[in-house]
């Protein structure tokens, strides 16, 4: 068979096998893993297909989704879980009816909600001068997000309002003036001061129209300094308390005792709102475990006291330990209390960082001269009445 005859046969039967078919490739924006409500766009690219006009066929799994589309793209304006699946495409060139190879399958996954998670490194309890980085991550997705950072404060006009399930206002969000809105999900504070004490959270967004994630978890930062402008005074003066007891928290400023408010963040991730206030003193008449958390004083201008960790225990034994850091070289006394009465009828073990430090029959122990190495988590244990929660005991350097 001569070449002319072969070419004639090929023309008659429109054979395309003499040239290699171009390959179709599917791309998905903003990401292969998206969330319900986002706008998703699929695009079919013909590699090596030139700029000639193509018609596109789209397939989901094993059936035809859109048979003949002139445009390369199609979109879900508000994606739902049903749209999850494997997608492929193929092109048909209208000038000569040549088809591309079908693309490799690309899987689109649609999840119910976009959740952000804040973590902190190295620690959330810091000393003035330290540096700390808060990281914001969108669960199961890392592409195309921009992030904004906020502090959580009592709501006032002009702030973003966060409401509960019943429509009640929980708190307000105040955008940080130096909030990073770039693609990086981290927020770094260098040379922190006590005024950085507070509760932080992040939001992420992407796409057009803009899609917002849910608010992140709340992340407290607690910073202690040597000379804060005000002190949080706790009465009774200890960090652990029994349920059903009463407690007062007051802000004591040597120059001005007004203009300060007690703030708090409890362990069930809620801002503390004092229901009984007298001047700068907050009175709690009936403690519950929900009061466990971090507390500090704050002025309208943003000045803060050192934060204090308060633990409310529903057991029978607590540890009486100092509220504020003890000066190095001074003595430290710890007591084991049984429903507000010092245990003295039998042996009590005192622990530091889960190792027995002393065993005492008096219900109290003393370190005559403390140093930085004595810092740690302390608790006490009675053989019959139980053990206390742990409390962090810190020390500060003496300056003459």
Predicted regions and their residues:
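Solvent-exposed loop segments of extracellular immunoglobulin-like
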Residues: 46-62, 138-153, 255-264, 338-354
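Short beta-strand segments within Ig-like beta-sandwich modules, predominantly Fibronectin type-III
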Residues: 63-71, 175-184, 272-279, 354-363
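Extracellular/luminal immunoglobulin-like beta-sandwich modules
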Residues: 88-112, 199-225, 294-314, 379-399
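Short beta-strand segments of immunoglobulin-like
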Residues: 29-34, 121-126, 236-241, 321-326
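A short beta-strand segment in extracellular, disulfide-stabilized domains
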Residues: 33, 38-46, 131-138, 246-252, ...
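N-terminal Sec-dependent signal peptide, specifically the hydrophobic helical h-region
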Residues: 1-27, 111-118, 220-235, 245, ...
């Amino acid at each position: 068979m001569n070449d002319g005859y072969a070419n004639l046969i090929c023309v008659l039967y429109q054979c395309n096998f003499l040239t290699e078919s171009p390959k179709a490739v599917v791309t998905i924006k903003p990401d292969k893993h998206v969330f319900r409500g986002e706008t998703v766009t699929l695009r079919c690219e013909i590699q090596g297909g030139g700029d000639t006009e193509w018609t596109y066929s789209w397939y989901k799994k094993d059936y035809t989704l859109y048979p003949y589309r002139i445009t390369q793209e199609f979109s879900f304006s508000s994606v739902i879980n049903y749209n999850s699946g494997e997608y492929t495409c193929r092109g048909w060139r209208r000038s000569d009816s040549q088809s591309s190879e079908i693309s490799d399958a690309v899987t689109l996954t649609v999840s119910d909600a976009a959740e952000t998670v804040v973590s902190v490194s190295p620690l959330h309890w810091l000393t003035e001068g330290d540096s700390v980085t808060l990281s914001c991550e969108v669960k199961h997705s890392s592409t195309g997000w921009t992030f904004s950072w906020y502090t959580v404060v009592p709501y006032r006009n002009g702030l973003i309002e966060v409401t509960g399930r019943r429509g009640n206002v929980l708190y307000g969000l105040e955008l940080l003036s130096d909030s990073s809105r770039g693609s990086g999900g981290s927020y770094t504070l260098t040379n922190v001061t006590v005024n950085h004490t507070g509760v932080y959270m992040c939001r992420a967004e992407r796409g057009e129209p803009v899609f917002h994630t849910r608010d992140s978890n709340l992340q407290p930062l607690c910073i202690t300094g040597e000379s804060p402008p005000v002190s949080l005074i706790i009465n009774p003066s200890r960090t652990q308390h029994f349920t059903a007891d009463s407690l007062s928290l007051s802000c004591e400023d040597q120059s001005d005792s007004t203009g300060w408010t007690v703030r708090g963040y409890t362990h069930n991730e809620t801002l503390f709102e004092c229901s009984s206030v007298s001047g700068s003193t907050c009175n709690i008449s009936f403690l519950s475990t929900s009061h466990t958390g971090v507390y500090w004083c704050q002025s309208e201008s943003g000045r803060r006291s050192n934060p204090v960790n308060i633990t409310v225990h529903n057991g029978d034994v607590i540890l009486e330990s100092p509220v504020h850091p003890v000066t190095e070289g001074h003595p430290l006394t710890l007591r084991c209390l049984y429903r507000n009465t010092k245990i003295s009828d039998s042996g009590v073990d005192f622990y530091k960082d889960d190792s027995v430090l002393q065993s005492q029959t008096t219900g109290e122990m003393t370190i005559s001269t403390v140093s930085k190495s004595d810092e740690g988590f302390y608790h006490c244990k009675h053989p019959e009445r139980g053990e206390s929660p742990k409390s962090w005991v810190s020390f500060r350097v003496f300056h003459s």
